[in-house]
Amino acid sequence: MEKFKKKLVEMCKVNVKAAVVFIILALFLALLGIGDSEGDVYLLAAGIFAFVAILMFGTAGTKKKRIKAQLREMEEEGSLQILYNDFSYTGAKFSKKYQVAYGRRYLLDFAAAKEGFRIMDLQEIHNVFCCNMVDGEPQETIYIALETADGSRTLVGSAAKMTEEFSGMIANLKQITRLNGGAQWQ
C-alpha cells in the first residue's frame, strides 16, 4: 500500500528542465548585470526568471501535499483500499507525462483537480475517443474524452501530438469501457 501511495504522489508533474533553464537564464542575466552601468535591467530580468523557477517548484510541492492529504483522508474513510485493489493488478497504467493513471475500474486524473486528484469510475464511461475541441473551439492540444451514457464529457490527459503512449492509453481505455458495456466510435 505504501508503494502505491508513493507512486500516486510522484504523479505530480514538475517541469524540471524548464525550471533549470529559468535558473540558468537568471544566473546569466545576473552576471551580465553585475558591474554594468545598465545592469539594473539585467538584474531585474534575472530576478523575474528566478521567481518563475521558484514558483514552478513551489507549485509542485503544494500539489504533492494536497495529494498526500487526499490519500490520508481516503485511507481514513477506507476508500483507498478500493483504489489499491484496482491498481494492484499488472495491467494498471501510470503516465506521469499525461498525469493520468487507470486500472480496470477507476481512472485518476492528476492534471485537472486543484485539490489532489480526480477519481472517475470507468464503469460509468460509455465512450472513449480522441478530442481536440474545448467548448466548441478547436485546440492544438489533443485530449482523451470520456463520455457517459447521458452525453456529458470529461477531458483528461492532454498531449501536444499523438504519441504511441497516448494512442495506447486511448486503446486501453476503449477496451476497458467495451468490457463494461460501453459503445465505441470507430
Question: Model-flagged regions — what are they?
Answer:
Residues 128-186:
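Acidic, Ser/Thr- and proline-rich intrinsically disordered linker/docking segments
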Residues 97-102, 118, 145-147:
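Short, exposed beta-strand/loop patches in secreted or surface proteins that constitute
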Residues 8-69:
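Alpha-helical transmembrane spans
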Residues 15, 27, 74, 78-81, ...:
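Short, flexible helical or helix-coil boundary motifs
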Residues 2, 44-102:
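Anionic N-terminal interaction surfaces
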Residues 7, 70, 169-172:
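Charge-rich, solvent-exposed alpha-helical interaction surfaces
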